[in-house]
UniProtKB/Swiss-Prot annotation:
Primary localization: cytoplasm
The organism's taxonomic lineage, starting at the top: Bacteria, Pseudomonadati, Pseudomonadota, Alphaproteobacteria, Rhodobacterales
Classification via CDD domains: EF_Tu, EFTU_II, EFTU_III
Domain tr-type G: 10-201
Organism this protein belongs to: Roseobacter denitrificans (strain ATCC 33942 / OCh 114) (Erythrobacter sp. (strain OCh 114))
PANTHER family found in the cross-reference section: ELONGATION FACTOR TU, MITOCHONDRIAL, ELONGATION FACTOR TU-RELATED
Function according to Swiss-Prot or TrEMBL: GTP hydrolase that promotes the GTP-dependent binding of aminoacyl-tRNA to the A-site of ribosomes during protein biosynthesis.
G2, as annotated region: 55-59
Name of the gene encoding the protein in the UniProt record: tuf1
Entry protein name: Elongation factor Tu
Amino acid sequence: MAKAKFERNKPHVNIGTIGHVDHGKTTLTAAITKYFGDFQAYDQIDGAPEEKARGITISTAHVEYETENRHYAHVDCPGHADYVKNMITGAAQMDGAILVVNAADGPMPQTREHILLGRQVGIPTMVVFMNKVDQVDDEELLELVEMEIRELLSSYDYPGDDIPVIPGSALAAMEGRDPEIGEEAIKKLMAAVDEFIPTPERAIDQPFLMPVEDVFSISGRGTVVTGRVERGVINVGDNIEIVGIKDTQSTTCTGVEMFRKLLDRGEAGDNIGALLRGIDREAVERGQVLCKPGSVKPHTKFEAEAYILTKDEGGRHTPFFANYRPQFYFRTTDVTGTVQLAEGTEMVMPGDNVSFGVELIAPIAMEQGLRFAIREGGRTVGAGVVSKITE
């Protein structure tokens, strides 16, 4: 049977459900597919397969659906630890999120934690679904819960006053009853998501960046750098910079090859070889990046949000303390760095997610939101994301 062709006639947005355990994330996901996609039953979504991202095993369910304006890929995770790991590793990129809050409970510890994580890992916006409203008889109580959610969002620098909060019942929508809080609430929610979560800039429209994977010298032609273009476009004749590890160098791309064919350009997603003018083979190494001049700077100090693997996940068996010195694997290479723990944090246990500062021994081309693995002698012991660059 021929595979269904992916129609790219609508903008594509990646989204996910977040929120406290048992507040109805998976039921809501199922309800959205009932009205906007190929219906997926609750247990189909909940029995999510495991996948590996940056050496970490995560269970995530992926569903897709579309509104009149957009195509959505939606991720839902069965357990809280899976959410933390997913958000930190960026295994399933989220351009926006639907925060699910049970109206009877109001915001709970994981509600807060997911909002904070969203802020740290750079989820730009959220829309709120206030679920299980049929379990609350008092209209004033609903208003209080809504206020509480808005204040919580504002306290983490989200626009709490402007974020749409949609009351409803995912279960009513699933069971096809009480349309006002069922089907209509789901439709209102998706209208809010359509309107409030911005369409992300496509990778190809962003400034050019390619991590260096390998470097060759071709006699009579010069130095060729290979890698996969992460974003943007490179044209023959473009000026580019080589950033990271050593001092930044400027050069011109004099040729682009793909599968040994000469091209006039390479774009996001392509595996290419770029021929660089006047650059010695020794001057470029794996771990640097080629990029549009001035678009990315090298840094050594940053703050990070990280998840530390448990022993069962193949991680450390013991906690680590201040001045822990693992390797930080950025894009294509390991760089040693020293960890500075926050005041009041004595140690970090396997299974924790934690914020800390890092100082690398060599500069790396980095931006806020860049993901990395934490490794010890080639073994992954954690994953993290740059939440703030300090130097």
